[in-house]
């Protein structure tokens, strides 16, 4: 939450003030964008300031994936233009959950999206249980090290 945002010395400015639509609240800090395998092991991730939208880091995250892979995302990753450019640049298909007023995905993509949604939510809850939202680091480098350690622990937990 943004209660202590003015007192924070590690990060300053409006770049770190974001809005979480799922929780319908504002927050101050970072967003973690994570790509996992169907077994829940992290493959690629990036930390982004809270202000920026979900589609900003998706090109960077998909460059490490082999061509022909399909990435499933939530409603924040809905963009036909970005999905087409990612497919052209890296050969990775981006399938995002559609909003109610949009044309639905193909039936097999919807079926796979529902199947992998449980894995996505499980990984998110595991990260919350590890205390990722309450990391108390003195420097930004220390914060990044703690995020690395949490993701390493997650990959070991999901072997």
Regions flagged by a language model, labelled:
Residues 54, 116, 148:
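Hydrophobic (often cysteine-bearing) scaffold residues that line and stabilize catalytic clefts
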Residues 150-159:
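Charge-patterned, long linear interaction tracts outside catalytic cores
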Residues 1-90, 98-99, 151:
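Polybasic low-complexity intrinsically disordered regions
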Residues 1-5, 105-107, 146-148:
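Short, solvent-exposed polar/charged micro-motifs at secondary-structure junctions
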Residues 22-25, 137-147:
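Structural motif
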Residues 70, 75-141:
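Helix-centered, glycine/charged polyanion-binding patches within enzymatic domains
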């Amino acid at each position: 939450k943004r209660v202590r945002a003015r007192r924070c010395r590690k990060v300053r400015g409006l770049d770190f003030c974001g809005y979480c639509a799922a929780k319908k609240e504002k927050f101050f800090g970072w967003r973690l964008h994570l790509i996992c395998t169907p077994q829940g092991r992290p493959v690629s991730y990036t930390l982004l300031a809270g202000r920026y939208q979900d589609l900003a880091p998706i090109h960077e995250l998909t460059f490490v994936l082999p061509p022909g892979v399909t990435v499933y995302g939530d409603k924040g990753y809905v963009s036909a233009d970005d999905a087409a450019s990612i497919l052209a640049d890296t050969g990775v298909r981006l399938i995002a959950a559609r909003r109610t007023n949009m044309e639905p995905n193909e039936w097999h993509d919807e079926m796979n999206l529902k199947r992998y949604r449980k894995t996505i939510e499980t990984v998110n809850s595991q990260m919350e249980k590890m205390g990722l939202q309450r990391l108390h680091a003195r420097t930004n480098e220390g914060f990044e090290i703690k995020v690395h350690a949490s993701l390493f622990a997650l990959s070991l937990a999901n072997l």
